[in-house]
From Swiss-Prot:
One of its GO terms (cellular component) is cytoplasm. It is found in: Cytoplasm. ATP binds at N39, D81, K100, F126. SMART domains: HATPase_c. Belongs to the heat shock protein 90 family. Residues 225-245 have a biased composition (Basic and acidic residues). Molecular chaperone that promotes the maturation, structural maintenance and proper regulation of specific target proteins involved for instance in cell cycle control and signal transduction. Undergoes a functional cycle that is linked to its ATPase activity. This cycle probably induces conformational changes in the client proteins, thereby causing their activation. Interacts dynamically with various co-chaperones that modulate its substrate recognition, ATPase cycle and chaperone function. Required for piRNA biogenesis by facilitating loading of piRNAs into PIWI proteins. This is Heat shock protein 83. GO terms for molecular function: ATP binding; ATP hydrolysis activity; ATP-dependent protein folding chaperone; unfolded protein binding. It comes from Drosophila miranda (Fruit fly). The keyword Cytoplasm applies.
Length: 269
């Protein structure tokens, strides 16, 4: 029997902030992606730091990355990281019931004319998701707890329940249900533009799932290895989605900053 979802009220200042974000017109809504990628990077930093003293922390997944998955059919943009993840109490406390010290300060700054893009400096960048989404789910798995899912369509409350869907291993998956008038944020070119503009200095791979076969830069040795794999698989081509590293495909066959030649090879997902 599935566990029932528990409902929690947003702390009053957080509810006010969300209302402000949802009901005010902001021109630079795109900063939501910068904030969510920044949070993902912080979560990756935390698990990497923990693994320095306890390598077994990475037994739940050694690869550290951020993945973006636009789905036009479902109208969702999903941001996945293999970072430290959140426990149930983290989801309840960090995403709604305990106001960060910056919540009130940011609202006051906004009302005094500050730009929405400053939201991350006040520690409440997560809520920028509601600039472009009318519903958000956050599925998370921390090494010290089971997998849980947080959900809210704003409106003053959120739910948290045990999650028995696809196991994450470790990390966090944020699904944004995009507002009908914001669907340009599901376009591959738009996502790449935002990532290259705001998140180019993130220290982890940012992978973008795309609907067609694309090219990805690799080293000569990797290219040779994967070329063999491709030859073995060339009769198996399908229209399945593919992954590419954001910002790599335009620089095919150029030397990288270390002077190494890179080739483009096709990577299947």
């Amino acid at each position: 029997m599935p566990e029932e979802a528990e409902t929690f009220a947003f702390q009053a200042e957080i509810a006010q902030l969300m209302s402000l974000i949802i009901n005010t017109f902001y021109s630079n809504k795109e900063i939501f992606l910068r904030e969510l990628i920044s949070n993902a990077s912080d979560a990756l930093d935390k698990i990497r730091y923990e693994s320095l003293t306890d390598p077994s922390k990475l037994d739940s997944g050694k690869e550290l990355y951020i993945k973006l998955i636009p789905n036009k059919t479902a109208g969702t943009l999903t941001i996945i990281d293999t970072g430290i993840g959140m426990t149930k109490s983290d989801l309840v406390n960090n995403l709604g019931t305990i106001a960060k010290s910056g919540t009130k300060a940011f609202m006051e700054a906004l009302q005094a004319g500050a730009d929405i893009s400053m939201i991350g400096q006040f520690g409440v960048g997560f809520y920028s998701a509601y600039l472009i989404a009318d519903r958000v789910t956050v599925t998370s798995k921390n090494n010290d707890d089971e997998q849980y899912v947080w959900e809210s369509s704003a409106g003053g409350s959120f739910t948290v329940k045990a999650d028995n869907s696809e196991p994450l291993g470790r990390g966090t998956k944020i699904x944004l249900y995009i507002k009908e008038d914001q669907t340009d944020y599901l376009e591959e070119s738009k996502i790449k533009e935002i990532v290259n503009k705001h998140s180019q200095f993130i220290g982890y791979p940012i992978k973008l799932l795309v609907e067609k076969e694309r090219e990805k830069e690799v080293s000569d040795d990797e290219a040779d290895d994967e070329k063999k794999d491709d030859e073995a698989k060339k009769d198996m081509d399908t229209d399945e989605p593919k992954i590419e590293d954001v910002g790599e495909d335009e620089d095919a066959d150029k030397k990288d900053k270390d002077g190494k030649k890179k080739k483009t090879i096709k990577e299947k997902y």
